[in-house]
């Protein structure tokens, strides 16, 4: 064989090999606009929320739109948000989701938690479990993520709805909180403010700005959540019963204009974040790697970045972020992250779809 031809073939082969080795992901569900949340059904099909108000079932490489959704208020950051299965979904069939709704008092909308069942391609047995009030025409800070603990309590987050100076620090008001309910929507008897006069009994923690990532740590059973700061001051927190997480009294962030709204980054009696980002990365979506699919990455926390369009692999030492490594750089605005039943990590990316993170 001519030496030049041989060398040309070798260069092409090495280039292709290098490309295949450096490929970080493969697209599993293409052509999604804003996959705000997704979850895996027992048959490994995927239930996906699109922020503009669609629920999609992806099965056998085919998308089917689910009918029977409640009326969804789409404004600013609000719309159809997270979705999660009951831990005993195989036994009871319950699906839980959060969305913005105009129901209730006042103009505009606010975050709502509903449960329902899937019958064919239709939602049935729908029941609102919680509706934050009052409604607001502001377009920001609806939250919202959902997580279940081992006792089947459901936790869900609602942002401060742009009412920074009233909502987060007042337990008689909704918004700027993480809530806990029983799986049927009733209030757990050991909720922290159940005996406080005038308090919203579903509140589990308060002093939050806009939590858009929440997950039960599979190694410790703690509730981990992250939230958006303003200009700087995005946070990761470990959520504890009845605790105050400081917003807006204490923050590492400043106003978007560059002015300060507080000189304090910590206050006695309020919880400090275990990690914060300045400048902001605009975090959304969260998952722990608990499978063996990624080797030494097991135990890492994954956080999506809307602003900088990557996934941060947070390497943990105890309850601290020791180091961050950027994955899927420039992939697009990362909205949601889940570990599938197969142990692989799946990432929802705006204007792309859902991708599978490939082990190296």
Which ranges hold each PLM region?
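Short edge-strand/loop segments of extracellular domains
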Residues: 100, 228-234, 238-245
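Surface-exposed loop and turn segments in beta-propeller and other repeat-based domains
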Residues: 65-78, 126-142, 183-204, 247-278
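Bacterial Sec-dependent N-terminal signal peptides
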Residues: 1-23
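Beta-propeller blade signature
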Residues: 111-121, 170-184, 238-240
């Amino acid at each position: 064989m001519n030496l030049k031809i041989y060398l040309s073939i070798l260069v092409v082969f090495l280039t292709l090999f290098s490309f295949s080795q450096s490929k970080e992901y493969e697209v599993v569900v293409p052509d999604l606009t804003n996959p705000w949340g997704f979850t895996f059904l027992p048959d490994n099909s995927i239930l996906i929320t699109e922020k503009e108000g669609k629920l999609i079932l992806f099965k056998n490489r085919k998308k089917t739109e689910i009918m029977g959704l409640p009326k969804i208020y789409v404004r600013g950051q609000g719309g159809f948000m997270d979705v999660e299965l009951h831990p005993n979904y195989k036994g009871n069939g319950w699906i839980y989701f959060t969305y913005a709704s105009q129901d209730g008092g006042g103009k505009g909308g606010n975050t709502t938690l509903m449960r329902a069942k899937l019958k064919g391609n239709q939602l049935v047995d729908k029941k609102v479990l919680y509706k934050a009030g009052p409604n607001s025409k502001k377009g920001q800070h609806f939250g919202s993520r959902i997580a279940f603990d081992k006792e089947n309590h459901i936790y869900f987050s609602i942002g401060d709805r742009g009412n920074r100076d009233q909502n987060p620090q007042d337990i008689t008001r909704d918004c700027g909180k993480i809530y806990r309910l029983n799986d049927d929507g009733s209030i757990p008897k050991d909720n922290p403010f159940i005996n406080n006069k005038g308090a919203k009994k579903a509140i589990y923690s308060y002093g939050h700005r806009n939590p858009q990532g929440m997950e039960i740590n599979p190694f410790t059973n703690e509730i981990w959540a992250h939230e958006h700061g303003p200009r700087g001051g995005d946070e990761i927190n470990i959520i504890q019963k009845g605790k105050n997480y400081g917003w807006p009294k204490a923050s590492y962030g400043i106003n978007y204009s560059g002015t300060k709204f507080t000189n304090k980054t910590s206050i006695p009696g309020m919880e400090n974040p275990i990690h914060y980002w300045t400048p902001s990365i605009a975090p959304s979506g969260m998952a722990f790697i608990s499978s063996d699919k990624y080797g030494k990455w097991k135990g890492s926390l994954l956080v999506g970045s809307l602003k900088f369009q990557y996934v941060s692999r947070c390497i943990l030492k105890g309850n601290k972020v020791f180091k961050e490594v950027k994955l899927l750089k420039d992939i697009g605005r990362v909205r949601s992250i889940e570990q599938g039943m197969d142990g692989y990590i799946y990432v929802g990316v705006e204007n792309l779809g859902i991708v599978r993170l490939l082990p190296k």
